[in-house]
């Protein structure tokens, strides 16, 4: 996906992330390994709301580490500052980079499904420039945020199996795939 005015971290060799089997992924649904695959697997309702949530989490990270920069760029105000997902994004530059790539992937997927750009993309350039303000570090285990569904939790560092179980159990009753994507195989019980 080519985003006007957006910098995809995949386009910058020194900032590329390894999305192989060793690196997986208010919530961040780690239902696939790669951010593009996650975005394609989200239901229509989530591809509408999740880009804003991810933008808010990324902006919260920048407010935490560089309030002067966040203020200068007029980023979204900090939200849910003690929630595990924003805390994970602000912990290391690698975490932030993964969350940023997921944000860009969701913006592209929204455009694919709805034929227009999501309003949450307005901060993408400032967020991409702000990555250097996040502390360096490798990816860390992602928290499992399943309110009321602790039975879905696993001992995975990158809880794809857990998030798929949660997404299927908690979201399949309302999840629609009418905008150019099919329901993922794993949600149909075939994988």
What are these regions (language model features)?
Residues 1-13:
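Extreme N-terminal basic, low-complexity initiation segments
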Residues 13, 17-82, 87-191:
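Sequence termini and other peripheral, non-core segments
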